[in-house]
Amino acid sequence: GPPRSSLHNSLNSFAFYAVNLAGREQQALPQSPFQPYQVSFAAPTAKHVWIVMADSLRSDRLGVMGYQRDTTPFLSRLRDDGELLVRQGIAAGVSTAVSLPVFLNLIREPGQNHLLREQPHNLFRLGREQGFNTFWLSSQESKLLTFAGKRFIDVSITREDFPLLFSQRQDHALSDLLPRKQWGERNLVMINLRTAHSPYDHNYENHDEPIARWPTDGPLSRDVREGNAYDNAVRYFDDVVADIVAQFDQLEGERYLLITGDHGQLLGENEVWGHNRLLPPVVDVPVMVLARDAPQGALDDLAGQRWVSHYEAGLWLAQRLGARVVNPNADPAVHFVKGKLLLGDNSIMQVKESGEGLQFSEPMLLSKWLQGPAQRTLPAPDQPADPG
């Protein structure tokens, strides 16, 4: 469609503020018991650190992660060739507006809104301080930048900047735009894909290559039709990633590409669709890493884990930038997922690793959690702090 007017964008921003932000800081939350994270720096060796974050990407619908349909032929080929590390991930939140800033600001424990405002260990901030040029390329709207660290981003491109290109090419617009970037000596690049956001077929229906594999018309039930459309959108995502990796492989020097989803998706379980709910299918995301010209052991911190949370992935990315973030509050077997609100008295859920799998606690209001249970998540005084 036509570019949106400044009035439209102003109203959009005001509506976002009115719905999500206004008055929330006046809701006095109990003080959080958490100690500040410590950051130390060393000279980075990586030349390029790329992050691909796809919308609504649920790992158990990816062929590369065992799904019976071949929804990810390119990624599966990388894995089969021993080039791609693949792990089940744990999302930071159940909506894009929550998960993305919590991930980028390396926040583990809920109730620390000052870390969203001050951004002491935001990935873009760490990257810029370490001499990286910083890029944000998104097929979504610019309002997602609100708490993402936009003041530390050198080049930002969103859907509003190239409306015609994005309407015609969808996520492939980003791979079209990548060659135009003038890379510096070191580059931190965030690529934010729309991917499998509903309505799923809108993400791939204009694509001129034959990738849609499963039928979405005819006498199909909603479950079958929507499920097929979702799988087709994932298949389209795989095609976009293939283009991104082709350009990543043209670069030189030590480089890393991490792929994840902002959150998962409900696909008809108990007749519920979408996300925004603290339920296991919405927490379920992939974490996949491609390394080139990397030193031995660069992936060990991730490869040794069965599950990788967004927070843990962020710590690993920070290390690629030469920044080591130590969290004295961390328990490596306990993770937190934030509900659909970024600020205020949001619902949260604790996820605990066990030998049998992930254990999901009942969602709880942040205010109630801070009044008691939060204290019990802290390491014992004689227990050494986990570096992650």
What are these model-derived regions, one by one?
Residues 1-51, 56-214, 284, 310-339:
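Active-site-proximal alpha/beta segments of enzymes that process anionic O-linked groups
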Residues 1, 125, 142, 246-250, ...:
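Membrane-interface soluble catalytic domains
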Residues 198-200, 267, 296-298:
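Short acidic/glycine-rich loop or secondary-structure boundary segments that cap or lie
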Residues 143-146, 194-243, 247-251, 276-284, ...:
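Active-site-proximal cap/lid insertion segments
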Residues 35-39, 222, 270:
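Hydrophobic alpha-helical segments with strong N-terminal bias
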